[in-house]
């Protein structure tokens, strides 16, 4: 036994490694991106974040995003709540018994909320919008649904989350996250007895042993004070800091009577508090702080904060553990915390005053944990339920800890989180310095974010690298600039988007991490879909521009996260024609919910609005660039949003993409002919791939790297993703990485050389018309709609698509439409659409088993 880990080592017998721990039979070598990645075990699997999965124990697949877990029938049955079903498993064998679809399928399950009564059979589940689902679990694990209970009080969406049941199982206290209330629900009568206001977005709930006190975590803290900054979330204003990140988290104490609720106190805890866990015998309450990388420990007798536990295995690691689920050992000495940000469970020794937690490797994105009979059960949001025997010998403890650290690249992250390791005076400038703070030959970074294309859709016909011409939708005639840029500078054919739609895609592109508030809320609609409009969605690390400003860098934004552009009854054709005629007859207004971004944004640059051509966006930027040329100053970091490759319904898909291509070419040409070109790097990528077609996988996309220092004509097949871009930007600008996931990502040295070529880029004009309209009577011609002639149902589905915001559409319908337009008469290759993973295995990468479920836009 080791002194550093007494609580865990005293639990039970030695862990027995299952087949899941043995080397993979495929024989494929891991992708070797850099020296630090060469050291990982050959059986590890890489996920899109660049992290490895080295899961120990058994892992059982359950469909959907996995959200919560509890035991039933005296611990014999393990229940797992997902976005779509309540699943039951034999806790001993981990055999999946049943997947019971929720009674209200369209509502699904909310991101939290599953409770089992003391009888071990009665179950209550929080639905996605307005209802609680009641069920009975038999001794054999079979689930039978009972009557659902409407807890909405007439509201459209209250989004119930945490649930706690009274000892007799007759009543429940339920967090109503959208109305900021705690409800007392009569489960027998099937009605809400009363409600009480608590903090913003109540999340987790626990009930004292006597049933007289409820403890409620408020994910958004208290309502903002009169002098505090505030931004919206779910119809409620949230107190925020200057970055528009939530200012605080709180815990409410609520007195519970037979038919009454009364808030009796409130205590500040960590940021984004989620699950609460009551240890009644020891008068302790644990609160997981997703945004605080910590667990708050409350003395329930005094109602005061007794200590804060750091869930980082090393205090110097960057922010980003994303601590969510909690469980306590039977002896009360070890707290288990699900660290979703590093795919591990942290084991915290509560008997030690200060002790760094040891780690147990989990699956992808652990979100809930439970402990019973010496076994740890982990619900991994992205890839299944895990069962592992808790280790009792020092060797296994050390092995698990080392494996979890290696899989999450913690040593790599720690190295770069600590800042400069050598003096800048002794290092020669290079494009991507080896260490934080060393000089870069690049001074200005331009980051261009576009919408929704895979690698094969655009570059499948490029004639080199891992490309598939049979899947290209927008060939050289449509995208001559994309092709020319990828041919002149590096072609990256192993690059991936971390997200699956614009909601999490823009988060990955600008924050490099996504918390459980979004990862778990796939059908519950607590988290706003439009990224940039929900303050509780924003990660504790802030955005890349916050990071740059914090480190004294200058910044300018063109359109990113301006989701509220308003038009005055104008169409794409109106803007296109007005621009050709000299302008002045069309107008729009912009608006931002992120105050810090508003202050650094070009007021005349439109954000999301498919009726505005990307040519207009290029015009505005180039005018601004000309003014900066005269002033002789250009920002250290510039973000430009060019969204029209998303496509919409007014024009043909090729016209939208050609418009986007020409705008990109014009921007690149303008920058390359400017006085700032000599020390500039431009990164161009998509926010997400929109489950499009690609022969490797639907997450594979393209990244264009443009610079005098970018390698000419190089083929770069190393694994990169959106967090690689962010880490590279940070390194170039002399900043430490902004969070744990970014810190663990590879930087993109292989795309650059030390020899500059200042030759400017010359924009090419697409052969495709930029304003080719979709024929209104196309159903009769077969050209449009893109479905079999006479299929009015699918035609109606396309006509009903909502293009008012990014990805508010059914991906399959739009993808079928684009395919039929661009490759008329050819069979739709459904097998290569979305997250199919057919080409990942050969690259040492892993398919998310639940990715197909993720790809559906809400």
Residue map of PLM features:
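Positively charged n-region of N-terminal signal peptides that target proteins for export
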Residues: 1-4
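Bacterial N-terminal signal peptides
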Residues: 6-16
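Predominantly soluble domains enriched in secretory-pathway, periplasmic, or organellar proteins
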Residues: 20-430
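N-terminal pro-sequences and low-complexity stem/linker regions of secreted or lumenal proteins
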Residues: 403-858
């Amino acid at each position: 036994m080791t002194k550093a880990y007494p609580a865990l080592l005293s639990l039970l017998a030695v862990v027995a490694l299952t087949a899941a721990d043995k080397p993979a039979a495929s024989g494929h070598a891991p992708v070797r991106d850099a020296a630090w990645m060469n050291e990982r075990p050959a059986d590890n699997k890489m996920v899109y974040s660049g992290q490895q999965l080295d899961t120990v124990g058994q892992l059982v697949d359950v469909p959907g995003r996995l959200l919560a877990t509890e035991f039933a029938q005296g611990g014999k049955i393990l229940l797992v709540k997902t976005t779509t079903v309540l699943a039951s498993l034999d806790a001993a064998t981990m055999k999946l018994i049943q997947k019971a679809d929720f009674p209200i399928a369209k509502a699904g399950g909310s991101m939290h909320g599953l409770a089992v009564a003391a009888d071990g059979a009665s179950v209550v589940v929080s639905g996605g919008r307005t209802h609680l689902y009641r069920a009975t679990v038999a001794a054999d694990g079979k689930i039978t649904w009972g009557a659902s209970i409407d807890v909405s009080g007439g509201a459209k969406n209250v989004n119930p989350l945490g649930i706690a049941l009274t000892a007799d199982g007759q009543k429940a206290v339920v967090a109503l996250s959208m109305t900021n209330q705690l409800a007392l629900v009569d489960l027998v009568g099937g009605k809400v007895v009363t409600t009480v206001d608590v903090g913003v977005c109540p999340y987790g709930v626990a009930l004292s042993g006597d049933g007289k006190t409820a403890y409620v975590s408020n994910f958004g803290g208290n309502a903002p004070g009169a002098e505090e900054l505030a931004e919206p979330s779910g119809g409620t204003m949230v107190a925020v800091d200057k970055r528009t990140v939530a200012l605080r988290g709180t815990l409410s104490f609520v007195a519970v009577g037979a038919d009454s609720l009364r808030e009796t106190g409130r205590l500040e805890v960590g940021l984004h508090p989620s699950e609460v866990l009551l240890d009644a015998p020891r008068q302790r309450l644990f609160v997981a702080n997703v945004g605080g990388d910590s667990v708050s420990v409350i003395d329930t007798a005094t109602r005061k904060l007794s200590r804060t536990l750091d869930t980082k295995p090393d205090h110097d690691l960057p922010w980003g553990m994303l601590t969510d689920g909690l469980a306590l050992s039977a002896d009360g000495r070890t707290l288990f915390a699900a660290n979703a940000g590093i795919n591990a469970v942290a084991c915290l020794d509560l008997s030690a005053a200060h002790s760094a937690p040891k780690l147990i490797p989990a699956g992808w994105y652990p979100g809930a944990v439970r402990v019973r009979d010496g076994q740890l059960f982990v619900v991994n949001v992205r890839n299944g339920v895990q069962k592992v025997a808790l280790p009792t010998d020092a060797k296994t403890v050390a092995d698990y800890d080392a494996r979890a650290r290696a899989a999450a690249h913690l040593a790599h992250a720690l190295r770069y989180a600590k800042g400069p390791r050598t003096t800048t005076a002794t290092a020669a400038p290079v494009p991507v310095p080896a260490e934080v703070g060393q000089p870069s030959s690049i001074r200005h970074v331009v980051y261009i974010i576009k919408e929704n294309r895979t690698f094969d859709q655009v570059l499948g016909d490029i004639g080199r690298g891992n490309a598939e011409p049979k899947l290209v939708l927008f060939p050289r005639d449509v995208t001559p600039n994309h092709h020319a840029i990828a041919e002149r500078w590096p072609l990256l054919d192993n690059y991936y988007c971390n997200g699956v739609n614009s909601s999490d895609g823009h988060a990955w592109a600008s924050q490099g991490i996504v918390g459980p508030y979004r990862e778990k809320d796939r059908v519950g609609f607590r988290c706003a879909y439009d990224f940039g409009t929900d303050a509780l969605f924003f990660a504790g690390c802030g955005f890349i521009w916050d990071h740059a400003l914090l480190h004294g860098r200058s910044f300018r934004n063109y359109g990113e996260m301006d989701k509220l552009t308003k038009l005055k009854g104008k169409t794409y054709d109106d803007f296109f024609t007005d621009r050709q005629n000299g302008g002045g007859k069309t107008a729009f207004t912009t608006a931002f919910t992120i105050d810090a971004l508003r202050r650094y944004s070009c007021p005349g640059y439109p954000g999301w609005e498919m009726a505005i051509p990307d040519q207009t966006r290029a015009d505005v930027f180039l005018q601004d660039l000309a003014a900066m040329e005269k002033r002789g100053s250009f920002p250290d970091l510039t973000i430009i949003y060019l969204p029209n490759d998303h496509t919409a319904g007014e024009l043909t898909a090729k016209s939208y993409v050609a418009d986007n291509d020409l705008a990109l070419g014009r921007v690149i040409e303008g920058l390359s002919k400017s006085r700032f070109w000599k020390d500039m790097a431009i990164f161009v990528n998509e926010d997400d791939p929109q489950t499009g077609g690609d022969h490797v996988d639907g997450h594979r996309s393209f990244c264009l790297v443009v610079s005098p220092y970018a390698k000419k004509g190089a083929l770069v097949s190393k694994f990169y993703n959106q967090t690689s871009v962010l880490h590279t930007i940070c390194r170039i600008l002399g900043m430490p990485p902004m969070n744990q996931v970014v810190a663990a990502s590879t930087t993109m040295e292989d795309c650059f050389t030390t020899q500059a070529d200042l030759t400017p880029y010359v924009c090419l004009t697409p052969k495709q018309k930029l304003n080719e309209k979709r024929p209104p009577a196309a159903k009769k011609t077969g050209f449009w709609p893109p479905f079999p002639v006479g299929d009015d149902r699918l035609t109606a589905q396309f006509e009903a698509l909502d293009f008012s915001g990014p990805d508010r559409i059914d991906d399959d319908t739009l993808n079928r439409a684009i395919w039929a337009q661009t490759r008329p008469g050819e069979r739709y290759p459904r097998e290569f659409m979305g997250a199919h993973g057919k080409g990942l295995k050969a690259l040492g990468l892993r398919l998310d088993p639940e990715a197909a479920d993720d790809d559906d836009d809400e």
